[in-house]
Design a protein with these regions (language model features):
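A short, N-terminal "cap"/entry segment at the start of jelly-roll beta-barrel domains
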Residues: 1-45
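Conserved short histidine dyad/triad with adjacent acidic residue
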Residues: 44-62, 97
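Short, conserved beta-strand element in jelly-roll/cupin
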Residues: 53, 62-77
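A generic "binding-loop/recognition-motif" signal
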Residues: 54, 83, 99, 107-109
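Short hydrophobic/aromatic-rich beta-strand segments that constitute the beta-sheet cores
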Residues: 60, 77, 111-114
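Short acidic-glycine-tyrosine-enriched beta hairpin
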Residues: 81-97
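Double-stranded beta-helix
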Residues: 104-142
């Protein structure tokens, strides 16, 4: 598989497919969620997605670090010990891997999400070391 040096997409035109929220996580309403992945890193640890959801309140578990950027609508989020926050168009947030949060969508929300799976600490150390070595041999900018 050869990956392009640059991948670009119009987030408004990404075709989403049904991606149901776990029924046990729904607090109220009948939220309908859809999503699509549009790219992945070479090593597979980072992926980019577009996700949307209709009205409802639910809990959400983050299996990976997830950076979200709201591109339409809004959502109110909260987590244990963290004040409630409404994210609207243009807002971004980071949800840490292994955490739970509560999401309340008043009408509709659409987000762009970047998911990064955490590496085991020993692998992480090796990656950081390899990057340091690679910097020494990096070609000079033209």
């Amino acid at each position: 598989l050869t990956l392009s040096a640059i991948e670009a997409v119009s987030l408004d035109h990404v075709l989403l497919e049904d991606d149901p929220i776990n029924r046990d996580w729904i607090i109220f309403g009948t939220p309908v969620a859809r999503s699509a992945q549009w790219s992945a890193s070479k090593d597979g640890t980072t992926t980019t997605h577009v996700w949307d959801c209709t009205k409802g309140r639910f809990r959400w578990y983050f299996h990976a670090d997830e950076i979200v950027h709201i591109i339409e609508g809004s959502v109110t989020v909260q987590a244990d010990g963290i004040a409630e926050r409404t994210l609207s168009v243009g807002d971004a947030a980071l949800f840490r891997a292994g955490s739970w949060s509560e999401w309340e969508v008043e009408e509709y929300v659409r987000k762009h999400a970047i998911l990064s799976s955490p590496l085991h600490p020993t692998v992480s150390f090796g990656v950081r070391a390899a990057r340091r070595v690679a910097r020494v041999f990096r070609p000079k900018a033209k």
